[in-house]
Amino acid sequence: MKFYASSQIGIGKAENEDRIILGKSVIAGGSFITNIENGIVAVADGVGGNNAGEIASHFVATRLSNAQSVSFESLSQINTDLIDLSHVNPQYKNMATTLSGINFNKDKTLIFHIGNTRVYALQGSKYLKQLTNDDTTLNYLLVSGRLSPEDAISFDKKNEIIACFGGGTAALFKANVSAVDILSPILITSDGIHDYLSVDELEDTIDNYGISLQACERLIELARQNGSKDDASVIMGGVE
């Protein structure tokens, strides 16, 4: 299966806190094409409001790149080790990262997720279906009916997450790992992309450019045009 990926540091930022995992490779910037039959493809986004987001995302991404498979238990151990690492250096205090991805292997395909990075499936070569639920205060309030879609537009804590790796406490680790049938291409994005592009814009770009590196780079360009100053990362590819 062929995968295309691109990651770009945010405007005015010193470090890219996003990490892309493509099999055994961890990517902190640039554009890449690779073939993966069995392995992990994922995006980790270091939490910008905490210390050392790039350390957290790189730590989790590196551990995943060295793994053969994913399970809730293996992710939980990575989380424990990340929290332990955060105690070593005061500059690492409460460091945290999100993570969303797919583990392809011969026996079964797994989707794993925590935070507000996203995985989509491209159905019928045209329509995106979001396979993950955002672990954010905003989404929680919307799903619980405590906030209307109209009020959500002006909600001032849209990026506040309620689950992640690290964050100084194991209570924030609420990862979801489940088996899934992937019969179509996938799209994985950090919030520097999907917070600034509508589903229609995502779909139109893929329709215009196909599943390609050009499409990945165009999504980042469009997000920038729409005001994104955040790190922006995209993976697309897989079953066609």
Regions found by a protein language model. Name each.
Residues M1-E240:
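PP2C/PPM-type serine/threonine phosphatase catalytic domain
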